[in-house]
């Protein structure tokens, strides 16, 4: 009998899909991710179901669409009634450990207004055992730095300023003050190795989170100079940001509102004013941060190999969301463009190698990760999960009833650091959009703003809105109906498979039935 399976769920932050060498990013060096891709299956059409971090991680770990979990923005609470991956793992005998963060604001009905968790961007999701948390306020990391003998500056975040400088005007080619040996990526790796070494052969589940390549976009030596800006792909954008802004009121708001200071510690000015040379340098730094994470993963992978646990460990690599990186003159993860939503997903399952090295083109979403892990460990996803297990796709091509489009959402209500709701004159519950997209067309529906429609064959980068073009009227109607049907099929369904009968309670779907609506 084979030993119980281990699971390593690696969740990086803000790593977009087209920065994966196995998918064509040949300008990058990621030997450890490359190994994972060779031994597992890489999903080419994978998206997060929402952005930014908190909502995205809520979907990843609950298996629910934004429309169902309703933790719609960073700082918006997650209803305590929802189960999640960690709670489900406990039901089948695992003690789920977490390194990193989940950016979860707790249900205020379970605490009180003075709870310190309500003063931070987010805390840990219930059910996980923290063995190296970043939150709250990165205290775990800064405490580790101090324990290593590093003299923290009065403003702790100043460790991400360039060496010898008190501020940075924007993009920089300088290394940050902190060394690679003391970076946050190293901190998470050390926590992971400490946890793994203490398991003593017992089965484990570890959520291993990394903060990078999330901003600030500054890397420690030698990663700051590992890539030449001239080797980076050019940004995809109109000749000027004003042309982009004409596409939609929400895009116009972000082009005017997003500041460089959110991406370069101490910088000023609008992100949309970055010239092409600056974007190339920013991308080179971003690539360096990616390689730093990959080198750290190499240490974890080496330990698994040397201790005989590599072959018995399911490894899933993914990101919470993407990053615009100057495409469409934007920085961050906002709006509706692919760059914010398309993310990596690589799955290597212990004992499954029939499709090792394959690139799977089926449409997959972050809500699929939870059902995949639970099924791999002999459990089952909750009835209300919006995702489907990916295990069949590890053995053969997608089944005939697999989804035929991607679905993702974004809520842009005001939070303390961004106020689109106020700027656009909307109520908070009007600040919502959803997207349905296949290989041919992309439809963006807004609760209270004009829709968008793109012909992806003719306009893959989505510059021309065809929603009002009479030639496309029938297509717009078709995809609007697809969006409505998708939402109706995935309405909350925790108890809808039960019914009372004269003979008593009847369950219409067996608990282990894996069928899910597309």
What are these regions (language model features)?
Residues 1-444, 451, 462-478, 508-518:
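Formylglycine-dependent sulfatase
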Residues 302, 448, 488-492:
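Charged/polar positions within long, soluble alpha-helices
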Residues 459:
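Intrinsically disordered, low-complexity polar regions and short flexible loop motifs
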Residues 470-497:
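A contiguous, mid-protein "functional segment" used to position or interact
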């Amino acid at each position: 009998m084979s030993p119980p399976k281990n699971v390593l769920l690696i969740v990086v932050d803000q790593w977009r899909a087209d920065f994966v060498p196995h998918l064509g990013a040949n300008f990058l060096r990621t030997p450890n991710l490359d190994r994972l891709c060779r031994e597992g299956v890489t999903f080419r059409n994978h998206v997060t179901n929402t952005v930014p971090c908190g909502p995205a991680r809520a979907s990843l770990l609950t298996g629910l669409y934004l429309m169902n979990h309703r933790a719609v923005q960073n700082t918006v609470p997650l209803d305590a009634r929802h189960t999640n991956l960690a709670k489900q793992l406990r039901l089948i005998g695992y003690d789920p450990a977490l390194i990193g963060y989940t950016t979860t604001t707790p249900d205020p009905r379970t605490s009180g207004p003075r709870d310190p968790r309500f003063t931070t961007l987010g805390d840990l999701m219930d059910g996980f055992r923290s063995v190296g948390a970043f939150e709250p306020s990165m205290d775990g990391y800064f405490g580790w730095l101090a324990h290593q003998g590093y003299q923290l500056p009065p403003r702790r975040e100043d460790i991400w300023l360039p060496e010898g400088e008190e501020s940075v005007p924007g993009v920089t080619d300088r290394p940050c003050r902190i060394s690679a040996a003391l970076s946050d990526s190293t901190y998470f790796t050390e926590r992971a190795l400490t946890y793994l070494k203490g398991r003593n052969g017992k089965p484990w589940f570890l959520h291993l989170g990394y903060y990078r390549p999330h901003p600030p976009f500054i890397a420690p030596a030698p990663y700051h100079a590992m890539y030449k800006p001239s080797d980076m792909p050019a940004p995809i954008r109109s000749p000027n940001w004003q042309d982009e802004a004409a596409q939609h009121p929400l895009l116009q708001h972000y082009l005017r509102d997003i500041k460089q200071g959110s991406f370069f510690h101490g910088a000023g000015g609008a992100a949309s004013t970055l010239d092409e040379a600056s974007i190339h340098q920013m991308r080179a730094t971003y690539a360096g941060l990616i390689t730093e994470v990959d080198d750290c993963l190499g240490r974890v992978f080496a330990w698994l190999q040397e201790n005989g646990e590599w072959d018995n460990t399911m490894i899933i690599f993914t990101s919470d969301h993407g990053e615009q990186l100057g495409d469409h003159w934007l920085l961050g993860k906002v709006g509706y463009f692919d760059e914010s939503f398309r993310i990596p997903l690589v799955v290597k399952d212990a004992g499954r190698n029939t499709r090792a090295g394959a690139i799977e083109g089926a449409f997959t979403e972050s809500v699929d990760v939870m059902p995949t892990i639970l099924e791999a460990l002999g459990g089952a996803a909750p009835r209300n999960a919006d995702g489907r297990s990916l295990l069949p796709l590890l053995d053969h091509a997608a089944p005939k009833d697999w989804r035929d489009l991607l679905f993702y959402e974004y809520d842009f209500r005001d939070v303390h650091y961004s106020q689109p709701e106020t700027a656009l004159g909307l109520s908070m519950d009007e600040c919502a959009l959803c997207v349905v997209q296949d290989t041919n067309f992309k439809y963006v529906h807004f609760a209270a703003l004009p829709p968008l429609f793109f012909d992806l064959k003719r306009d893959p980068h989505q510059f021309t809105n065809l929603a009002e073009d009479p030639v496309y009227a029938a297509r717009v109607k078709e995809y609007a109906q697809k969006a409505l049907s998708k939402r109706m099929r995935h309405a909350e369904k925790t108890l809808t498979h039960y019914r009372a009968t004269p003979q008593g309670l009847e369950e219409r779907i067996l608990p282990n039935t894996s069928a899910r609506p597309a």
